[in-house]
């Protein structure tokens, strides 16, 4: 597939050599706040105006591929495409609401973006029915479907979304050729499997292990404070004046002591370093050490500042991103299967099977 006439040849330029600004799109200009869309193939960003896409279509983009990816010049699967092992990707659009001047995507299992627009469309059709006979036909259709949701789907081909049941060898040959050997579907399913079985469980496990380690660290802090309080009480009780009477404690002497916790960072927090008792004992015997059992024991550590919140936020963001990717891949697989099912049934009809 060749590039559109309005699209310049591909350039690998990512930064303006004069200004040092990052550049994007086919125009290789910086981001000045214009409406842009991200390519799912090469991860670059493109201006709607440069791609000749009306801005009102911004909510209808489901999966976008730039002209270079659609031509096989860039993208994750460009090598497979060059070797003839894959098909060129295409931009997928969400179904537009049936109201002519509305550019919002349809709700699931609906032809409208909202119930209000559904009622508006039906009311418009009803107002155009000129005779009682026309209204009687519509009334009969509603009565036959029995439910408003079924009426909304009246005339749709639900079998297109269902798995194909192959009955003959000829049908199997067509099914294998169109569906089984489709590299786009295989790539999407492989990506989904990797997200579900490798990436997502990995980061969930990392977050779980971090929480376990933080629980261990809290127990360490608790035991260290207990020892600190016991030591302070022992010192106060041992202070007696020359008459053999105990001195009065200074007001709020124990409370005025700053409560500090050690840094607690450990590069191998996926496993608990040792028991709480062992760590507290070893720390008590060597309070000058800056690391015990690979745990940073500095009282004020700038190197590992906010390491807990940083790691937690990183893992939560990764999990959220992967869950969004999982949902998106599931939708893409569903859409691709529907495309292939249509191709399969068209070929069945063409061959007269």
From Swiss-Prot:
Zn(2+) 2 binds at residues 39, 42, 66, 69. One of its GO terms (cellular component) is Set1C/COMPASS complex. This is COMPASS component SPP1. Its main location: nucleus. The keyword Zinc applies. Residues 235-244 have a biased composition (Basic and acidic residues). Component of the Set1C/COMPASS complex which consists of SET1(2), BRE2(2), SPP1(2), SDC1(1), SHG1(1), SWD1(1), SWD2(1), and SWD3(1). Gene3D superfamilies: Zinc/RING finger domain, C3HC4 (zinc finger) (3.30.40.10). The keyword Zinc applies. A zinc finger (PHD-type) spans 22-72. Component of the Set1C/COMPASS complex that specifically mono-, di- and trimethylates histone H3 to form H3K4me1/2/3, which subsequently plays a role in telomere length maintenance and transcription elongation regulation. COMPASS recognizes ubiquitinated H2B on one face of the nucleosome which stimulates the methylation of H3 on the opposing face. SPP1/CPS40 can recognize methylated histone lysine residue H3K4me3 or unmethylated H3K4. Stimulates the RNA binding activity of SET1. The PHD finger is responsible for methylated H3K4 recognition. SMART domains: PHD. One of its GO terms (molecular function) is zinc ion binding. Residues 245-255 have a biased composition (Basic residues). Zn(2+) 3 binds at residues 97, 102, 113, 117. Signal peptide: none annotated. GO terms for biological process: positive regulation of DNA-templated transcription; regulation of DNA-templated transcription; regulation of meiotic DNA double-strand break formation; subtelomeric heterochromatin formation. Zn(2+) 1 binds at residues 25, 27, 47, 50. It holds the Pfam family PHD. Residues 83-124 are annotated as: Non coventional C3H-type zinc finger. It comes from the Eukaryota. InterPro entries: Spp1/CFP1, Zinc_finger_PHD-type_CS, Znf_FYVE_PHD, Znf_PHD, Znf_PHD-finger, Znf_RING/FYVE/PHD.
